[in-house]
Design a protein with these regions (language model features):
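Extracellular/surface recognition and adhesion modules
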Residues: 42, 235, 262, 946-948, ...
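Glycine- and acidic/polar-rich repeat regions and solenoidal domains
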Residues: 322, 565-569, 587-593, 607-907
Length: 973
């Protein structure tokens, strides 16, 4: 909004406010600025940002922070965030992904290994200057060597630090960036500043202002705010002939909210004011139950710090609000609020591993592994075992300074291609049996510490059933005999397996092992760990926050972490929203929202859970009453750390609910499970749209990134305008099965799959983009398939009616019987009533038409004897699919077909006009709608576009105008 003030008093107040944020830069051409002044100027130009504690110029700079600066200096931040370029590194957190990806794709930065970026590691001067020189288009090993980058930088006029100056700081980087703006590229043409002005990163006027070269800038007004250091008396003072009274100050603005404050350092005598905040969340809640405003919305501001809970923080119906008077609990702008069930422990109790235990580790691990008595850490009871019919590892989750740690495993990979492949002995796929496997890996056979505690976790029977067991090892034969019964037994052949909880496999940063015999905890710390680092463990056995029966209650800007149960649980709520939150480290779910209407999760990051990270359900399928709930604009990753079977990263249920604009990645199994086995809630008329699914289904087969199965109540699901890429793995242990982007299983029917992009980036022979197993009445149209070897796989049962209605059929019959007498269902899907009445000719062919299928570096692999090699059916039943002749298929010719896309190399898969002309009914897919859109986070308000006019003299009027922005939209701004 635009606010214009025409009083001298108001202008002075405005300038005072601005000057508190932007130190004055000296006018003229001297440019003798302090590092702090440079940082403020660079912030004004959008090139440097602080933390919630200010610029912290004395602090060190990490590798991810360094590449973020470089990307901004190229004027490429918006492009990086929009495209989120791929990179091979597994240790990069979501926020840094676009910057690291851009830097990697443009040869600005490399990793510390093929798969590790070195996230959190401190950057050295040589490394930072190497990035800077690459930005200026100088080449490694041609123009300079990375370890002597300072020599070339100094020749170019860039500041370098003296030898033995200690660690490279953020302030050092600011000094370099400031000088870099006036440095020319290698070609000798324009300076970096000129290039950024041309790109629109900032204007020439803004640049001149920060240099003090524009007389209209704020610096030119500053003398009226500062006393003359050597004032001279007026030799002939004259009275003002027309004295004017001082203008009345503006009245206090009307309050727009009821603010209440709480702080972890607040005292028991706090009154909830900003200066005397309450000391606990319960104190605020109880105060508001008696004193909440009946005229204004209520906002509870949580001041920065860590709130350690010893029981669930409960909010109920009486704590909610109304549409006119909502209640919001939120972090104070610009401050970090952590709500946790773990007080944590300092690493000061740890010491380097020594003696016999040290000798058991790899040479590299011997240098880094640390150990402590678990009892001295006061983290709670630690145990490692199996639970849930041995489908789930029962172990805590650890984090170190907020970075997730992993139970030690061998090999260190999420992909079954890299796992050990063990031969099953005396296989039988019988429930309750004790599998046997034969180990041949010499490394593992050489290990001997606490062998009985090891967990053998693998796909021993089916490609979709990851489960585990303890066992006894015969060192002479290498045969391991399970001591835990298996739900599915084992199948013949070589099967992929991980070994968990073997001490000797503790060999990479972020791993941990607990010795259950000695009670000692071993960790391999991250590179930036110090003795003051905080180790947290999921020890509290309660949900952290519960909202039950409330309406119009919002939680914003919080970091919620560490519990054996769930993070935030909402039940029977209406118009309750979790926004701008980070939720990590839960043995249960990070978020569970049930029986809800108009409620959901948005603009948040969710990661590192033992099982599904999010559960959402709202609406009644029997009455078709909608929930209108949502999960939108979230990053969801690294879920299902200990269980994948029938889970998925997100369990999405309800009626007319929406899953939109999310990025879901780095999940070994299903990303989104919208229906599986009728009995509980289902999905009806739900929409899954504008999402990016990538690097999922990393280790299983016969499952989908988006999966629904065995539920006749699930109808009308729309899957549209999503992008699926880097799906699946190339493991050949189950050659008859693949992974899928979208999988409708065991008779699930009545969906629409439209406007999606499948590929590129599939993995070998084992990806089928869309699969339907026994279902019917689904439409797949206007989709783009890029290098998907099999675009569509459909299994068409010989007797559809029997499979749907017989309990020994597809497994869907019990759920069908729940709705085939429901007129709301049978009026929309008459085939249900027909099956109820004994009719058999009810199969409605699936439709696959108006799709574009392009191969750039692969050939289709579907039914080899079919006229449609990009389709796969059982018994060549392509004739039972409608529309196969109405698709555009472009096979690889002499070229690679990448020229058929607007900008394939940079991930723009819009089709050129000549392709669109070949399939007139195809609508161009709008990629700009896909994925996470930037969300404001917990930001402070800001003023920009300041202009001042008039005569800056006492008694005269000057006019100030500025644009006030408050990204969060909160009243505190």
């Amino acid at each position: 909004m635009k606010r214009i003030y025409k009083s001298c008093v108001a202008v002075l107040l405005l300038l005072a406010m601005l000057l508190s944020c932007v130190p004055a830069l000296a006018a003229g051409s001297s440019h003798s600025y302090t590092t702090l002044q440079k940082a403020e100027a660079l912030k004004t130009l959008g090139l440097f940002q602080g933390t919630n504690k200010g610029f912290e110029l004395e602090k060190t700079l990490t590798r991810e922070q360094a590449i973020t600066l470089i990307v901004r200096l190229l004027g490429a931040e918006a492009e990086a965030k929009e495209k989120n370029p791929a990179h091979p590194f597994t240790d990069v957190l979501a926020w840094a992904g676009p910057y690291v990806g851009y830097g990697y794709q443009n040869a600005l930065v490399k990793g510390v290994s093929e798969t590790l970026f070195g996230y959190g590691k401190l950057v050295t001067e040589a490394q930072f200057l190497t990035m800077v020189l690459r930005l200026l288009q100088y080449e490694d090993d041609t123009d300079f060597t990375w370890n002597k980058s300072a020599e070339l930088a100094e020749k170019l006029g860039l500041p370098v630090v003296p030898a033995n100056s200690g660690e490279y700081t953020r302030g050092n980087a600011v000094d370099v960036i400031w000088a870099l703006l006036e440095t020319k590229f290698k070609s000798g043409g324009k300076t970096l500043a000129q290039t950024l002005i041309e790109k629109g990163v900032f204007t020439e006027k803004a640049y001149r202002e920060v240099l003090g070269e524009d007389s209209s800038n704020i610096g030119a007004i500053l003398p009226i705010l500062r006393p003359d250091p050597d004032p001279k008396p007026d030799p002939d003072p004259k009275p003002d002939p027309d004295p004017k009274p001082d203008p009345d100050p503006d009245p206090d603005p009307e309050p727009t909210e009821q603010p209440v404050y709480v702080s972890p350092s607040g005292g028991s005598d706090g009154d909830g004011s900003k200066d005397a905040p309450f000391g606990s969340l319960e104190a605020v809640r109880d105060y508001l139950r008696e004193n909440r405003s009946t005229e204004l919305p209520t906002t509870v501001y949580l001041r920065g710090g860590t709130y350690v809970l010893n029981k669930t923080f409960e909010l109920t119906a009486e704590d909610g609000g109304t549409e006119e008077l909502p209640v919001t609990w939120r972090a104070y702008p610009g401050e970090t609020v952590i709500i946790t069930g773990s007080a944590g422990a300092s690493l000061s109790a740890f010491e380097p591993v020594s003696g016999e235990m040290k000798e058991k580790l790899s040479p590299d691990a011997q240098k880094h592994v640390m150990v402590a008595d678990a009892s001295a850490l006061d983290l709670g009871t630690i145990s490692v075992g199996l639970t849930q019919s041995n489908f789930c590892i029962d172990a805590p989750l650890f984090s170190l300074d907020g970075q997730h740690m992993r139970l030690t495993r061998y090999p260190n990979s999420n992909s079954t291609e890299d796992w050990m492949h063990v031969e099953t002995v005396d296989p039988t796929q019988t429930s309750g049996t004790y599998p046997k496997i034969k180990l041949t890996d010499e490394t593992v056979l050489g290990w001997d510490h606490n062998a009985a505690d090891r967990i053998y976790f693998g796909y021993f029977s089916y490609g979709w059933a990851l489960h585990g067991f303890h066992g006894t090892l015969d060192p002479e034969t290498g045969i391991v005999t399970a001591t835990d019964a298996s739900h599915y037994g084992s199948a013949a052949g070589l099967k992929p397996m991980l070994l968990y909880n073997a001490y000797e496999s503790l060999d990479e940063p972020g791993e941990w092992y607990y010795d259950q015999m000695s009670g000692r905890l071993y960790i391999y710390p991250f590179a930036d760990t110090t003795r003051n680092s905080t180790l947290r463990m999921t020890s509290s056995n309660f949900d952290l926050i519960s909202v039950n029966g409330a309406s119009y209650l919002n939680l914003e800007g919080l970091t919620v972490t560490s519990s054996k149960k769930d993070g935030i649980v909402m039940n029977n709520v209406d118009h309750c929203v979790i926004e701008n939150c980070t939720l990590t480290s839960f043995e249960g779910r990070a978020v569970s929202i049930d029986n809800a209407t108009y409620s959901g999760l948005k603009n948040s990051e969710v990661a590192y859970t033992s099982i599904s990270a999010i559960y959402l359900n709202g609406g009644d399928y029997q009455t078709m009453e909608p929930g209108y709930d949502f999960i939108t604009n979230c990053r969801i990753h690294d879920t299902n750390q200990y269980r994948t079977m029938n889970e998925g990263g997100v369990k999405f249920r309800g009626v007319k609910n929406t899953f939109s604009n999310n990025e879901v990645y780095n999940i070994t199994d299903m990303a989104l499970n919208f229906a599986i086995v009728g009995g509980g809630p289902t999905s009806l008329d739900c929409v899954i749209e504008n999402n990016s699914f990538h690097d999922v289904v990393l280790n299983g087969k016969d499952m989908g990134a988006v999966y629904g199965g065995r539920d006749a109540r699930c109808q009308g699901v729309v899957i549209r305008n999503n992008h699926f890429y880097n799906i699946a793995n190339n493991d050949s242990s189950f050659p008859s099965f693949s992974a899928n982007a979208v999988y409708l299983d065991d008779g699930l029917s009545g969906a629409a799959v439209t406007g999606n992009i499948f590929g590129p980036g599939a993995s070998g022979e084992y990806l089928e983009a869309v699969k339907i197993n026994c279902g019917h009445d689904t439409v797949i149209t206007n989709d783009l398939f890029i290098d998907t070897l099999c675009a569509f796989n459909v299994y068409i049962a010989g007797n559809f009616a029997v499979g749907m209605t017989n309990d020994s059929g597809f497994g869907i019959a019990p759920s069908l019987r729940q709705v085939w007498n429901n007129e709301l269902y049978t009026s929309r899907w008459p085939w249900m009533a027909a099956l109820r009445d004994g009719e058999t000719d009810v199969y409605i062919p699936n439709i696959f038409k108006n799709n574009v299928i392009i191969y750039t570096d692969a050939a289709p692999r579907g039914s080899e004897t079919s006229a449609y090699p990009w389709v796969k059916t059982n018994d060549n039943q392509e004739s039972k699919i409608t529309g196969l002749d109405n698709n555009l298929v472009i096979l690889k010719g002499e070229g690679d077909n990448r020229q058929l896309f607007v900008d394939y190399a940079n991930g723009n898969y819009a089709l050129i006009d000549s392709v669109l002309a070949q399939l007139p009914g195809f609508e161009q897919i709008d990629q700009s709608r896909i994925g996470v859109k930037s969300f404001p986070g917990n930001q402070k308000p800001a003023a920009s576009g300041v202009s001042i006019s008039g005569t800056a003299e006492v008694g005269q009027t000057i006019t100030a105008a500025y644009t006030f922005s408050d990204a969060d939209g909160d009243s505190e701004g």
